[in-house]
């Protein structure tokens, strides 16, 4: 299997993503998405790959998903002006999500990672599932060819982007991913440095001078109140022997 590596901080690269003015979102996206605009607007790019507001673009997919979620949870206000403000926030969130997914997808492609067709087939099956979650051949046969290809491309890009994000941050459970602290690398590098070294010689007790033992014991009477000897049968005799040694 071909090895691959993701560069750290790629998503935070200021040179990788060229973003147009956010203010243009308010005047261009809404009419274009509703059919009132003509042509596709280039919103930005990542690594030379353009991000547009085409109907099947990554941005439009993110906007559609977020807008449907907002509608489902009744997040859109009734007031028209307030609703417009909410929609602007949805547009901005969709743009940011599209940039992150595009960046993750492109970084994974550049890393050398290869997505197996078996994994892609397994993930695409859910698109042709019934209400109970089982695969439906009828639904697959009834899906137009261009929709199948579009769905397969969406799933491929999503899996590639997820692979990059997993490599950096791991799963929701906290397992996997780099998640390195900003000081961790420097700490590991410091561990490899030569901080100190020790040289020592082990001497047996029988080679230690008796007068040195006596002098050391007398200098620390509180710390060494009693010196025991294995040959002394009772504590009293051991104490006497210790005093005699001192």
Curated annotation (Swiss-Prot):
Transmembrane segments: 7-29
Source organism, top-level taxon: Bacteria
Keywords, comma-separated and alphabetical: Membrane, Transmembrane, Transmembrane helix
Lineage, highest ranks first: Bacteria, Pseudomonadati, Spirochaetota, Spirochaetia, Spirochaetales
Cellular component terms (Gene Ontology): membrane
Main location: membrane
Keyword Membrane (UniProt): yes
Name of the protein: Uncharacterized protein TP_0928
Topology term for the membrane: Single-pass membrane protein
Compartment list: Membrane
Organism annotation: Treponema pallidum (strain Nichols)
């Amino acid at each position: 299997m071909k090895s691959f590596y993701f560069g750290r901080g790629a998503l935070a690269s200021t040179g990788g993503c060229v973003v147009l003015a956010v203010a243009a979102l308010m005047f261009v996206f809404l009419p274009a998405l509703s059919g009132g605009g003509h042509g596709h607007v280039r919103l930005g790019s990542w690594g030379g790959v353009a991000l547009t507001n085409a109907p099947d673009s990554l941005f439009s997919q993110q906007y559609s998903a977020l807008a449907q979620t907002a509608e489902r949870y009744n997040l859109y206000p009734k007031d028209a002006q307030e609703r417009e403000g909410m929609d602007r926030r949805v547009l901005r969130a969709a743009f940011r999500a599209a940039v992150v997914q595009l960046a993750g997808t492109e970084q994974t492609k550049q890393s050398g990672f290869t997505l197996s067709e078996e994994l892609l087939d397994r993930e695409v099956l859910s698109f042709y599932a019934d209400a109970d979650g089982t695969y439906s051949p009828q639904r697959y046969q009834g899906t137009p060819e261009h929709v199948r290809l579009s769905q397969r491309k969406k799933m491929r890009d999503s899996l590639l982007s997820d692979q990059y994000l997993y490599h950096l941050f791991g799963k929701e459970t906290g397992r996997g991913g780099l998640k390195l602290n900003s000081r961790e690398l420097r700490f590991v590098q410091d561990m490899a440095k030569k901080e100190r070294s020790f040289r020592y010689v082990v001497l047996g007790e029988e080679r230690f001078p008796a007068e040195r033992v006596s002098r050391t014991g007398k200098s620390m009477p509180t710390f060494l109140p009693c010196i025991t000897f294995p040959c002394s049968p009772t504590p009293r005799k051991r104490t006497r022997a210790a005093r005699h040694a001192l």
